């Protein structure tokens, strides 16, 4: 919206990313207190599970749905400073806001019906699947578009070629540090793979969001790193050497650095109010959306496997739930962990909430640095 102030969007990318960060940060810090007051007035408080750690009972009634502020800050800042003609900006916003809408409905039902579970798992997963599959199909063809091309042209070319299942080499799977190896996924394989990445990332961040500040700082760290990878993928001077020699140049991917900067600013502003003891929770409206945002950015930059490394905390949290649920079912009631997700296990082992959070932050910082080291090595 405001990028017309710059003669060349490409040349002003770093400045626009900084302005996006600053704009989102100011929006979050300025509007946070008013939002918290309004949520309290509406009695939009979190219903706490009674089977969890007893220290969490004091959190009952804490305002939730604060993730709406994160999404508003990201969206407004991105619309102000990003190149709105960029095809990748819109697909990331589509997933982010679409998953945010699912989360908003889920949170609203929890509050109105005083039910900690909200939407049924089947209903939530169904809507996540619709958005995830739509984004996956879009990305499969959008990655085939040459610089200056349009999505409609990609659809037309695909139709003229009688719907080939391998649209472009850009939809291969690339391994970090591999010099020239790329696994061809084909159109169907790519859509399924992207669907898993987006939906999996969304649910992983949502599962992690169980303690004050636990999910938001890792999201900021990983999102910022993905912004750097997106810049590398879209820059012809770096593409192909960013993390694997076979990795493609993705024209337009660099613009996601602006959105990633907005995410970082909005996330840090939210952390100001979400730090222990939290004044507000992000709720599913924030957690589902931010996870989907991370997954989609990773797909555009073609660093899905690096996302799994940098977001290791999200992966472990998800695996702990899967292991606990599976073992409980087949062992007739026995458990591997005292409670899942695993951050509750450590609480029940005697760790203070702040110890769990800060230690998980430290692990994420190390994993993010490890993920970025691949970029530095090349």
Task: Please identify what each model-predicted range represents.
Residues 85-93, 112-127:
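Membrane-interfacial loop-to-helix junctions in multi-pass inner-membrane proteins
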Residues 110-120, 177-183, 352:
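Membrane interface segments of multi-pass transport proteins and intramembrane proteases
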Residues 49-62, 116-128, 343:
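Juxtamembrane helix-capping/reentrant segments at transmembrane boundaries
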Residues 2-40, 70-103, 133-173, 190-378:
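Alpha-helical transmembrane segments
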Residues 42-44, 114, 285:
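Juxtamembrane helix-loop transition segments at the membrane interface in multi-pass membrane proteins
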Residues 40-45, 51-53, 57, 69:
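A cross-family signal for N-terminal binding/gating loops and helix N-caps
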